[in-house]
């Protein structure tokens, strides 16, 4: 089905990064773009090189009418489950916007409860400029956090795999155990720390 923009002037796009990793927060961003300052080259953050993402991140954060972040920490993910924690992080991102949007477009197939109309857009990060912008802001933010975590725990290789369950990460979990930043409810982490 073809996506049709809603009739609203202040539209926020929302996306998340970090549902799959075993470590760190799930990070969401909300972005309201400025129609008078278009940004060329917005696309799904996963399809862009790191260098291109960084350049677009700077452009988005400078040119957008407003943008914000929302997050759910590992303890919240463990308590709620990853889906509910992601919805909570999205609600936080929208609530943190300094300008309240008239309408919210969310990447994926589910909408969190919001105080304004919202629509989930499947593959929205490739279809909707606002969602693409949000995906880039969230991805760059989370990748930077993983680079910082890598400084604290260099043996895990977080800067490289961003916390995803690669063979290297799983091997290090078994060898070294989990850090306090790992999601204890995720099966590979549970196994590593012996929580059956």
Curated annotation (Swiss-Prot):
It catalyses: Endonucleolytic cleavage to 5'-phosphomonoester. Manganese or magnesium. Binds 1 divalent metal ion per monomer in the absence of substrate. May bind a second metal ion after substrate binding. One of its GO terms (molecular function) is RNA-DNA hybrid ribonuclease activity. It is found in: Cytoplasm. InterPro entries: RNase_HII (IPR022898), RNase_HII/HIII (IPR001352), RNase_HII/HIII_dom (IPR024567), RNaseH-like_sf (IPR012337), RNaseH_sf (IPR036397). A divalent metal cation binds at residues 15-16, 107. GO terms for cellular component: cytoplasm; ribonuclease H2 complex. GO terms for biological process: DNA replication, removal of RNA primer; mismatch repair. Its EC number is 3.1.26.4. Residues 9-196 form the RNase H type-2 domain. Keywords: Cytoplasm, Endonuclease, Hydrolase, Manganese, Metal-binding, Nuclease. It is an enzyme of class 3 (hydrolase). Its cofactor is Mn(2+); Mg(2+). It comes from the Bacteria. Its main location: cytoplasm. Belongs to the RNase HII family. Endonuclease that specifically degrades the RNA of RNA-DNA hybrids. This is Ribonuclease HII. It comes from Photorhabdus laumondii subsp. laumondii (strain DSM 15139 / CIP 105565 / TT01) (Photorhabdus luminescens subsp. laumondii).
